[in-house]
A protein has these predicted regions:
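Sec/Tat signal peptide C-region and signal peptidase I cleavage site
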Residues: 19-23
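Interfacial loop/beta elements and low-complexity acidic/Ser/Thr-rich segments
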Residues: 187-252
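Bacterial N-terminal signal peptides
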Residues: 8-17
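Short beta-strand/helix segments in adaptor/scaffold domains that form protein-protein interfaces
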Residues: 227-228, 232-241, 245, 293, ...
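N-terminal beta-strand/beta-hairpin edge segment
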Residues: 240-242, 246-296, 468, 473-475, ...
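Short acidic, glycine/tyrosine-flanked loop/strand segments centered on an H-E-D-like triad
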Residues: 298-332
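Extended, low-charge, aliphatic-rich alpha-helical segments
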Residues: 25-211, 326-533, 540-626
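Bacterial N-terminal signal peptides that target proteins for export
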Residues: 1-9
């Protein structure tokens, strides 16, 4: 059960609800670069540091190539020996050689999107920028131009309230940082334009509906107490409840047992049998911690109290029975505090042992899954957020994340509020999606066969919209290096663009083409849907429909092929169905959508309300007897 709690939290995931950074674009709009310092020549120390970062980045890639069957081929392709020579060059880097090496990493060959390759690519680029700036007589002019572009882009974004003009900001900040220029300006703008771009929250009520249980069990009692054999029955009633705890630096989840055991026993020692009514109350708590690194737990904490009432004393002996009963009654009164203390201690030990045994394996499994299925998997693919914070209050668990590499920006405004009735919500800024898409797809070639293989590994079927028809040959797409797949959010609309720098259909090759569709967010009688605004648009990059420029015969042919396929990919109407929940959470769903908001600053907010309450279930727990 506890494993379910932890997994549920992770599935909905991982946040500081809403203790967001104070910085946002309004704080820098009036004077984006401030009193920027003058140009500073790149020092030997900075060149050596850039070379050191390149050497450091080679380690993980070297390990990857050592264990890869294609490692030798990659080393030859990347000119590994020259790469190592340049990494050891310090202040004597060869700019032309670094340019050549960088182009190899930026060629779009499949596999180069892996994080080990990407890290070296960034390190080569950083070293190249530092060395190029050091040897460029026009470096000061370039520096001033960058500051001007930054100021113009930030002012435009602040004035329009949209992120479109910020496209140049991420790469420009990265180049300034790599060449050691204007560190205060870089830090200031990174803070303003690097706010969290993914916020998730889940209510205790939602998870609790699949966790909370009624305890109702009758069990036999048979034990020794102060030399007497005690037998009888105990009836335990109570609740097992999920209880979120306030915590600023991690999520804290308690699984709490609150129960009362009413027992009726007879204790026999020699000729005397004592009939007793007992009441034991128990409060047990198993605490689990979840942060960005691991799932851990504390030992079970148990409180127990016992009260007894002697119902009667019988003596299995006629001779002297009255005297024996009198002595026994006095002895019982004297021993009652000791008996109560022993009973309370046994109750604590019993419940502690039981709770630990019930939760040990689920917690171990949850901790293992957190590492292997969440953290490690994201790290291996380079998807782990650059900032991830998990925390809780008395009612919710929050996950706050920011995904943005050094040459990318994130959100520049705070996220919209979540609807009060939402028990599960996700607030996604377009930068989260776009940054991840660029990291994963930029320059990559995807074939139908490769997509089929990936879908099969994931245990999914190929979407019909991406299947080649009987009369159509296999296809491939090479994604653009910049914004290969882009999400653009405006007030009440969502636009998705796919940019291909090259397409193939069988043996035929086609040049670059952009494909996009715009959807309106509509709601009616509490139901939400996305309605496509017109046809799917397919044009070459920078082509203006209705302008003087005309499509070539080849472009018209490709447009027809893509139109046929993408009209199936981008449905005219997408009805938002109630959300089916995974695993043990399934019984708490499906959740009807409560909120779907698209805002021009790039934010999408989706919230789901509680489903109708399921019938109560009963769980058993061994009786806690005095």
């Amino acid at each position: 059960m506890l494993r379910f709690v932890v997994r549920s939290v992770l599935l909905m995931t991982v946040v500081m609800a809403c203790r967001l950074a104070d910085a946002q674009i309004d704080t820098v709009a009036a004077d984006p670069v401030g009193a920027a310092p003058g140009f500073k020549a790149v020092s030997e120390k900075e060149l050596n540091a850039a070379a050191g970062r390149l050497r450091e980045s080679l380690g993980p890639l070297r390990q990857l190539l050592d264990r890869s069957k294609s490692g030798a081929g990659w080393r030859e392709y990347l000119d590994w020996k020259e790469l190592e020579r340049q990494a050891a060059s310090g202040t004597k880097a060869d700019v032309e050689t670094l340019v050549r090496l960088y182009r190899k990493f930026d060629s779009g060959e499949n596999g180069l999107e892996m994080p080990q390759f990407s890290a070296v690519k960034r390190a080569v680029g950083s070293y190249l920028e530092a060395a190029g700036t050091a040897g460029n007589p026009d470096a000061e002019k370039v520096y001033k131009g960058r500051l001007e572009r930054l100021a113009a882009a930030v002012k435009e974004a602040a004035a329009s309230g949209t992120p479109q003009s910020l496209e140049v900001v991420g790469p420009t900040l990265a180049r300034l940082e790599e060449s050691g220029q204007a560190p205060q300006v870089v830090a200031r703008l990174r803070k303003a334009l690097g706010m969290p771009n993914l916020l998730l929250q889940v209510d205790e009520d939602l998870v609790g509906r699949s966790v909370n249980r009624v305890v109702d069990e009758t069990a036999p009692i048979n034990e020794m107490l102060l030399g007497a054999r005690v037998c009888g029955t105990g009836h335990t009633t109570g609740l097992v409840l999920l209880d979120f705890q306030p915590s600023a630096d991690r999520a804290v989840v308690d699984l709490v047992l609150t129960a009362t055991n009413h027992s009726q026993t007879r204790g026999t020692k020699g000729p005397v049998t004592v009939h007793t009514l007992g009441t034991a109350t128990v409060d047990a708590r198993k605490r689990v911690f979840i942060d960005e690194k691991a799932v851990t737990s504390a030992p079970v904490d148990v409180n127990a109290s016992v009260a007894t009432k002697t119902q009667g004393i019988s003596v299995n002996k006629k001779l002297g029975a009255k005297l024996i009963r009198k002595i026994a009654s006095k002895k019982i009164a004297q021993m009652q505090p000791q008996a109560r203390a022993i009973s309370e201690q046994r109750a604590r030990q019993r419940v502690r042992s039981q709770f630990e045994s019930q939760t040990a394996e689920p917690i171990r499994k949850a901790a293992s899954d957190y590492q292997t299925k969440f953290r490690q998997k994201l790290l291996e693919r380079g998807w782990f957020p650059e900032m991830l914070s998990i925390n809780s209050d008395a009612d919710r668990i929050f996950v706050t994340a920011r995904k943005s590499l050094p040459d990318q920006v994130a959100a520049f405004t705070t996220a919209p509020e979540v609807a009060p009735a939402a028990v599960l919500s996700a607030r996604l800024h377009q930068s989260f999606f776009n940054n991840l898409a660029e990291q994963e797809l930029a320059g990559r070639t995807l074939t139908k066969e490769e997509l089929e293989s990936q879908m099969e590994k994931a245990g999914r079927k190929m979407p019909e919209s991406l299947e080649s028809e009987a009369d159509q040959p296999p296809w491939s797409i090479t994604f653009a290096k910049r914004k290969p797949v882009e999400l653009a959010v405006s007030d009440g609309t969502v636009k998705l663009t796919v940019r291909g720098s090259r397409y193939t259909s069988g043996d035929r090759e086609f040049d670059a083409m952009d494909v996009w569709a715009t959807y309106k967010v509509e709601s009616d009688a509490g139901k939400f849907r996305l309605v496509r605004d017109g046809d799917v648009q397919i044009y070459p990059p920078d082509f203006v429909p209705g302008g003087d420029r005309k499509l070539s015969v080849q472009q018209t042919s490709l447009r027809g092929i893509l139109q046929k396929r993408f009209n199936k990919v981008f449905d005219e109407v997408i009805d938002i169905k109630p959300l089916e929940l995974p695993g043990e959470l399934k019984s708490a769903g499906p959740l009807p959508m409560e909120q779907l908001v698209a805002r021009k600053d790039g934010w999408i907010v989706a919230g789901w309300r509680q489903a109708e309450a399921p019938k109560s279930e009963t769980a058993s727990l061994a009786a806690v007897e005095p």
